């Protein structure tokens, strides 16, 4: 064995324990009347709801396609819990209904039903159950995902009629009732007004051990400590984005920066059911400010606020609290939200009576606003406007108390420019955006002129009025004065958005890199750069035009160059590139675990929203460190995640992957996850950059967003992940941003990402992305052009017919993901070499992307393996049913037009064995697989052989005894990609395969 190989161990028990903790700590307890939870020892429980037999471990699409041996759902976990007794007769009733009414499965990708049809119940069923039980638990399930938004209809956003009827009847029969919401995102909560259950919990989608986390909370083994990452409004219509969230090709972000609580806490407090950051516990906490200090280093971003907060568990059971810190900033010329989250911290597990001191150091840059039109006198600049700044601390945005009442966190007399930027990404379409204004002005003598917070005189008057009261009452009264007197002065207005004034193409031309003279035949390899024997420039100068055109192409899905069944290979996609020591780097779908389409098992994690609801950076880091070890074991270098778009609207189908309506929380949780992966030498690819906040028509959707809203909301999470989390890989989105596809948007992937944030990694497109035509990127100021046929472009991309690579490379989006064959660059329609010849692309721009790719590849595990320094990971304590063996490499056999017959006579067919087959097929075509073989068992035998595509069973072929004769089983399948992996699983001994014939079906 090479002495440089690292030997590492992945303890499956510890991995499971950490995921289970996350699945418990992310649960949000919204209501617990009469303290019906936790369940007492010996509680008799009736479990209602069809969802008990259809637990959703994650949402749908690439973010949830993790192949697992077993999912422990809520019902199974409850049945195995020894401290409670389940109503078995009621469970059997649901079993019978499920057998007679099989779950709906949909027709494939983007077509899974949001929920299953509920079982009708009678009053008699509920009364009988109530006689046998102490409490009813009703389970409601929902899913959505990639290519599948939620809808404002029953069974999706709204409860169905049968679900409402179930809740009514259970409420009428039971004195104690809890509702569990197994959903990927928040749903309509109006049922609370009518049914009023005693306890309500969002249990989200907890991955493969999610049910265990739920039961830990229900029984009190874990005290709930999750907090909402979104505002739950009274109705869908209350969200300010709703009128511009739809199914067309244009989404106008008219609400601007006023997303989620930034809107509700400013002007619609009465439309909130549960505020951002809300979450109950089985105990109570007292939060007190012990120190607030301003460190005056110099004006601007280096100023910090030091804050010490003491948290005491004043209840009678151990628990954890989440302390949230919000800023209140002067309205100034720009207008601000009433509160903005600037930090948070979670306590340790505090026993009853125990205290913990939490120390915050908050850069005041987090208080700054972006001026995209020059209202402050500093255009394209982060600015602290003059006035008073206050801090509010609490367990949610609504209940946070001002801790700087006497003097303010700090005050400034003149505007402070914090960081000067360049105009970038501004809209090309004029529209009116929401602004915040105040009804209190200096001209109104009966009201204070300073409306952005209580003045010192206000505070003094309030303090005098309640001098005899206790400290807590004083804080409450001051808070009351602040809100009632000043916050209600804010109101909504609309003003024209600032539009683009620069020439994008001119900026590209003025910043072209210098070309490296071609240096043929030097014989340098990438490890020479790694070892310091040559520079990256010297190495890149060796690449020919052809090799430069190859290296900007990722190969997939299921490239034979890397782990079978993964999303793509990039870097060494041709023999010439590999001879130069450039490894083939493997990336795989995430973020809820690895998607291994070869059929091997992987760990399915809780969904992104649930992980963010923990408000726990360290837990997220630890969990993703385990995932990093699992990636090493499977030779996966990059996980395509985390997904960090903003919950702009509750109906976005992909909200389950994303974290929050708040960009700061999003960036902090993303940074923790990225750091966990990087501890193991692997990377996360943050996505989808940016404004991917809808799935309907996501390839053609143009998001019209102000530069201020982009920088403060939709880019902020990415910025934090890059600057603090040190993310080294970014994936652009499918759609357009202010008139240009993000895959070809120079100001996004170069001006902002690289030049302003200091990013030095790689940027890749989403899979089979559309690239904006050159006439759009060169003349995109109007935002008006004839859009191409997106469906045709997608079909062409699947089959390797490509367009407009020049616009992608010119934007410094380094990698097109994906092509069927990375080494072949002729005849596929990509314009890379033609653009070089015509002068629409320079060799220097290709060299720039090649250097980005090589710098990244040089630090991957793939590179370490190439030079004998890789890791060997051993899994300990894995269950016997987990297929965690290292994935074998698979040969892809091309199926010609006349078909292919593959000899299977050497396949053992031993019970429990698997056989992998790889085929190169035409994407989008339908194929017939005809298996021939014999069964040695008796004629009444029923020997199962299951045919899988990835982890999805296409058909279980039941073989009866054939007495040596040949029998045939046929399966049809429509492909979505070129390289496809199939698996035969032999459930019993006895079947001897002869061959399989694959033919393309006629359309």
Where are each of the predicted segments found?
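Short beta-strand elements
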Residues: 399-427
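Glycoside hydrolase catalytic-domain context in secreted enzymes
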Residues: 1-399, 423-1003
């Amino acid at each position: 064995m090479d002495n440089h190989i690292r030997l590492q161990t992945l303890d499956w028990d510890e991995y499971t324990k950490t995921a289970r903790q996350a699945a418990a700590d992310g649960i949000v307890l919204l209501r617990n009347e009469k303290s019906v939870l936790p369940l007492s020892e010996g509680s008799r429980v009736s479990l209602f709801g069809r969802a008990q037999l259809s637990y959703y471990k994650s949402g749908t699409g690439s973010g949830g396609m993790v192949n697992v041996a077993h999912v422990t759902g809520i019902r199974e976990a409850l049945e195995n819990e020894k401290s409670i007794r389940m109503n078995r007769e009621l469970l059997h009733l649901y079993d019978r209904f499920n057998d007679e009414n099989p779950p709906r499965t949909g027709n494939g990708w983007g077509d899974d039903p949001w929920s299953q049809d509920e079982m009708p119940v009678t009053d008699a069923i509920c009364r009988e159950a109530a006689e046998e039980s102490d409490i009813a638990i009703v389970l409601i399930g929902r899913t959505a995902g990639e290519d599948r938004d939620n809808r404002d209809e029953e069974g999706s956003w709204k409860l169905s009629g049968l679900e409402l009827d179930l809740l009514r009847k259970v409420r009428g029969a039971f004195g104690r009732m809890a509702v569990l919401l197994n959903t990927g995102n928040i749903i309509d909560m109006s049922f609370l007004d009518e049914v009023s259950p005693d306890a309500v919990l969002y249990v989200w989608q907890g991955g493969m051990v999610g049910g265990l986390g739920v039961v830990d909370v229900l029984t009190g083994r874990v005290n709930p400590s999750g907090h909402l990452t979104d505002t739950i409004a009274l109705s869908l219509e209350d969200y300010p984005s709703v009128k511009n969230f739809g199914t067309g090709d244009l989404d106008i972000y008219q609400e601007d920066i006023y997303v989620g609580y930034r809107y509700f806490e400013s002007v619609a407090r009465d439309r909130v059911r549960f505020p951002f950051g809300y979450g109950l516990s089985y105990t109570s906490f007292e939060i007190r400010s012990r120190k607030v200090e301003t460190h005056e280093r110099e004006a601007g971003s280096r100023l910090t606020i030091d804050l010490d907060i003491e948290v005491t568990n004043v209840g009678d059971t151990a628990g954890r609290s989440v302390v949230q810190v919000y800023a209140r900033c002067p309205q100034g010329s720009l207008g601000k939200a009433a509160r903005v989250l600037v930090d948070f911290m979670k306590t340790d597990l505090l026993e009853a009576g125990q205290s913990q001191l939490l120390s915050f150091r908050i850069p005041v840059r987090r208080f700054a606003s972006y001026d995209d039109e020059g209202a402050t006198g500093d255009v394209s600049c982060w600015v602290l406007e003059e006035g008073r700044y206050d801090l509010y601390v609490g367990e949610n945005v609504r209940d946070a108390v001002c801790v700087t009442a006497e003097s303010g966190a700090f005050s400034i007399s003149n505007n402070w420019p914090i960081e000067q930027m360049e105009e970038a990404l501004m809209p090309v379409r004029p529209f009116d955006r929401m602004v915040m204004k105040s009804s209190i002005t200096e001209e109104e003598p009966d009201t204070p002129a300073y409306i952005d917070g209580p003045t010192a005189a206000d505070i003094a008057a309030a303090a005098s009025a309640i001098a005899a009261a206790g400290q807590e009452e004083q804080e409450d009264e001051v808070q009351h004065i602040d809100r009632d007197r000043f916050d209600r002065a804010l109101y909504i207005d609309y003003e024209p958005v600032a539009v683009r004034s620069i020439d994008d193409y001119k900026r590209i031309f003025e910043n072209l890199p210098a070309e490296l003279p071609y240096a043929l035949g030097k014989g340098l390899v990438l490890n020479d750069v790694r070892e310091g024997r040559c520079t990256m420039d010297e190495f890149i100068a060796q690449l020919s035009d052809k090799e430069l055109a190859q290296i900007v192409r990722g190969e997939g899905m299921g490239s034979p160059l890397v782990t079978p069944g993964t999303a793509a290979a990039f870097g060494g996609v041709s023999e010439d590139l590999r001879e130069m020591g450039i490894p083939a780097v493997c990336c795989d779908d995430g973020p809820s675990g690895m998607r291994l389409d070869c059929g091997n098992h992987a760990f399915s994690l809780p969904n992104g929203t649930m992980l963010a609801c923990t408000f726990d950076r360290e837990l997220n880091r630890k969990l993703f460190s385990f995932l990093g070890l699992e990636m090493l074991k499977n030779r996966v270098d990059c996980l395509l995640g985390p997904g960090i778009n903003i919950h702009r609207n509750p109906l976005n189908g992909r909200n389950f992957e994303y974290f929050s309506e708040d960009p700061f929380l999003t960036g902090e949780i993303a940074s923790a996850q990225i750091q966990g992966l990087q501890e193991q030498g692997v990377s996360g690819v943050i996505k989808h950059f940016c404004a991917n906040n809808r799935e309907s028509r996501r390839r053609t959707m143009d998001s019209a967003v102000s530069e201020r809203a982009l920088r403060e909301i939709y880019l902020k999470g990415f910025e934090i992940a890059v600057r603090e989390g040190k993310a080294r890989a970014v994936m652009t989105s499918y759609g357009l941003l202010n008139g240009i596809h993000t895959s070809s948007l120079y100001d996004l992937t170069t001006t902002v990402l690289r030049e302003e944030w200091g990013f030095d990694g790689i940027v890749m497109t989403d899979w089979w992305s559309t690239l904006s035509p050159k006439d759009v990127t060169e003349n995109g100021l109007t935002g008006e052009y004839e859009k191409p046929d997106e469906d045709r472009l997608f079909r062409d991309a699947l089959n390797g017919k490509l367009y407009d690579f020049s616009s992608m490379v010119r934007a410094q989006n380094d990698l097109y993901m994906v092509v069927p064959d990375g080494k072949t660059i002729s005849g596929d329609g990509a314009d890379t070499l033609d653009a070089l010849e015509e002068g629409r692309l320079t060799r220097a721009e290709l060299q720039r992307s090649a250097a980005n790719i090589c710098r990244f590849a040089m630090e991957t595990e793939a590179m370490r393996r190439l030079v004998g320094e890789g890791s060997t990971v051993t899994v300990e304590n894995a269950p016997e049913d987990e297929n965690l063996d290292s994935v074998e490499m698979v040969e892809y056999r091309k199926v010609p037009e006349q078909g292919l017959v593959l000899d299977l006579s050497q396949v053992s067919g031993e019970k429990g064995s698997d056989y992998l087959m790889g085929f190169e097929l035409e994407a989008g075509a339908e194929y017939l697989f005809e298996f021939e073989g014999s069964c040695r068992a008796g004629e009444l035998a029923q020997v199962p052989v299951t045919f899988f595509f990835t982890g999805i069973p296409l058909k279980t072929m039941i073989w009866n005894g054939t007495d040596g004769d040949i029998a045939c089983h046929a399966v049809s399948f429509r492909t979505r990609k070129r390289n496809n992996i199939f698996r035969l699983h032999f459930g019993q001994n006895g079947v001897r395969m002869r061959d399989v014939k694959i033919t393309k079906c006629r359309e």
